[in-house]
């Protein structure tokens, strides 16, 4: 008898918590990662947070992902009769927060939706039915009674163009949706263990908010005019209460560092069309790894004058293909991009996979004819984006950024003190190749900055440049193999892995490998190997110091010696 195995059941649960007088958090806990979007790279699941404010008037702040439809709606109806809800505040219309808006409107057609102008436009296209609405902007208020006089703060591009924050002075709670969030699933409602959540908090920022650093600073400047913020009620992960000051400071510090970049790239996408927003985030993350600044702009809602100013001052432009049958505003903005492009700027193009993309090849030809430099091959998307697609986008962005800063790096190297660099160059280390695989994504890197750091458990550190492709595979919890090269028998492997690989290329083509128990490749010709797991990371200027614990290892040649890398100067590898 033949039976078809049932797909594994997703671990979904819900949770409620009274977080202040009259305010209840409704948390939808998604314990398993099932998306390839780049910000889910740490694979710690996520939560979708919604909030119910019950004063003289009742407001629901955001909803949940459609995968929680029955769980969420049953829980909501157990808390309150939906007919009593006066307002549905939509902070942002991405489906993971607004996936149940239509269901809530069906439960209570008289509810009034409160959102920004752009959010209401997106909702019209999503809901396809009339609904009561209030359009709000920064400084507008909504009085629910009993001191809950809500104030709204516009926060466009964090990370969608429609985002807004909501402040409740009665409880000193700031409702922020994606901002100050993290993809971290836990029963803990609040940020009790800062050390445990810190890597996820920064990774989420790097993926979604870092490419919008200027917008982050603009939003935080508006936040400065609010009252005391005692709790950040975010849309993903634990709420911030115990470490509010520290975690807000980190956002400000990271964003100030990003905004000081000497060179910038404008990354254009069309929100709510295909996978353009997700692909653009991956490209932007790759760019920011190199220290180049990014401005992310939604073509469907931007101002043409703003577009021309941004493009005019930028060193490069990345453009996602908009729909062929564009509306008038989108066509105007697309034309503004083309008109503002200048010779010698670098460019990159990618398909949005929205079903009606503008043809990409004629636009590439036009840019080349204008004298623009192509930073990476056009990214053509012929199927739902996979892990490999996002890796290609990330590495393409890194290539673009490295292209822009290459001349500045050479100039900086020449200006360094020669005696100092010669002295530092006398620090020697062994030769190793780090190999890693996570899902479909593989990576490798030649390394010499490796040092044992602990006996029990056995562990070591390795320095990884921020702009290395493998950096994204060496986050806390990731597994990899440290391949130790043999003296007198390392040249072939070293030469292979020193090559500059194009974005998305297979680093292991033509190399003999076997698979370690942790899933990463072992180089068959290595002297020895260690299977490792990343335990922690420390940021050090242009590198990450990655501390890893060893879980397994083997020596292939007992008499072999580790290859040693001797340098003469210390300003490059």
UniProtKB/Swiss-Prot annotation:
Its cofactor is Fe cation; FAD; FMN. Keywords: Electron transport, FAD, Flavoprotein, FMN, Iron, Metal-binding, Oxidoreductase, Transport. InterPro entries: Flavin_Rdtase-like_dom (IPR002563), Flavodoxin/NO_synth (IPR008254), Flavoprotein-like_sf (IPR029039), Metallo-B-lactamas (IPR001279), NADH_oxidoreductase_modular (IPR051285), ODP_dom (IPR045761), RibonucZ/Hydroxyglut_hydro (IPR036866), Split_barrel_FMN-bd (IPR012349). SMART domains: Flavin_Reduct (SM00903), Lactamase_B (SM00849). Its EC number is 1.-.-.-. It comes from the Bacteria. Fe cation 1 binds at residues 92, 94, 159, 178. Residues 265-401 form the Flavodoxin-like domain. Fe cation 2 binds at residues 96, 178, 236. Residues 43-236 are annotated as: Zinc metallo-hydrolase. Residues 424-573 are annotated as: Flavodoxin-reductase-like. Gene3D superfamilies: 3.40.50.360, Electron Transport, Fmn-binding Protein, Chain A, Ribonuclease Z/Hydroxyacylglutathione hydrolase-like. GO terms for molecular function: FMN binding; metal ion binding; oxidoreductase activity, acting on the CH-NH group of donors, NAD or NADP as acceptor. Binds 2 iron ions per monomer. In the N-terminal section; belongs to the zinc metallo-hydrolase group 3 family. Mediates electron transfer from NADH to oxygen, reducing it to water. This modular protein has 3 redox cofactors, in other organisms the same activity requires 2 or 3 proteins. By homology with NorV in E.coli, may be involved in nitric oxide detoxification. Homodimer. This is Diflavin flavoprotein A 1. It comes from Synechocystis sp. (strain ATCC 27184 / PCC 6803 / Kazusa). The gene is dfa1.
